[in-house]
A protein has these predicted regions:
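A detector for small-residue-rich transmembrane helices and their helix-helix packing motifs
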Residues: 1-191
Length: 191
């Protein structure tokens, strides 16, 4: 709420490449607590509401917090890397962290069904793959005001942290682990 009514506060804590490169790395975390408006915040929190219980149920509360904040950092680091020469690049939102939780939930429960456009039921693993392919497109096109790079980095964070916490997934869901890794590998090949 404060960020919506206090531009100085908003600018002080947003993700800003120039400021981060000047030593204000704390912005890589604080930006995750700022949102452009109420709909931005509500969409992130609604996604968290649906997928956090899956992660908490499988990994526990502490590991959920680790996935959340780890994904926020992964999203910020990938954004830093991708936009490193654009000193004016700015971003806010918990989308990287939330996408990490989403990808963790998909990895933990790949057979759950999700609604594409909230209507068409598709398997979670397929949604995860399509979502990251769309994120790659958005990162390359750079024609909207969406933090695709943070989303992608957050998903990578959720994927990696979940596999570190639950390495047996490599055996139990080998095919899903490989399928969900395809867009991640694809991005780094395209770079």
């Amino acid at each position: 709420y404060k960020g919506w009514n206090d531009l100085y506060f908003f600018r002080k804590y947003e993700f800003h490449i120039g400021s981060i490169r000047a030593g204000e790395q704390i912005r890589m975390l604080t930006s995750g607590f700022l949102h452009v408006d109420m709909s931005h915040l509500l969409f992130n929190m609604l996604t968290l509401y649906f997928f956090a219980p899956v992660v908490i149920g499988f990994l526990g509360t502490f590991s959920f917090v680790l996935v959340y904040f780890g994904s926020l950092v992964f999203g910020s680091l990938l954004t830093m890397s991708f936009h490193k020469n654009d000193y004016s690049y700015r971003a806010v939102g918990a989308s990287g962290a939330v996408t990490g939780v989403l990808y963790s939930a998909i990895l933990l429960q790949p057979d759950m069904m999700l609604g594409l456009f909230f209507v068409i039921p598709i398997p979670a693993y397929l949604f995860g793959i399509l979502y990251l392919l769309y994120s790659i497109y958005g990162m390359k096109a750079q024609n909207d005001n969406i933090g695709h790079t943070a989303h992608f980095g957050g998903a990578v964070g959720g994927y990696v942290i979940t596999l570190v916490k639950e390495p047996q997934l490599l055996v139990e869901h080998t095919l899903m682990v490989i399928l969900l890794a395809i867009p991640i590998v694809l991005l780094f090949i395209l770079e």
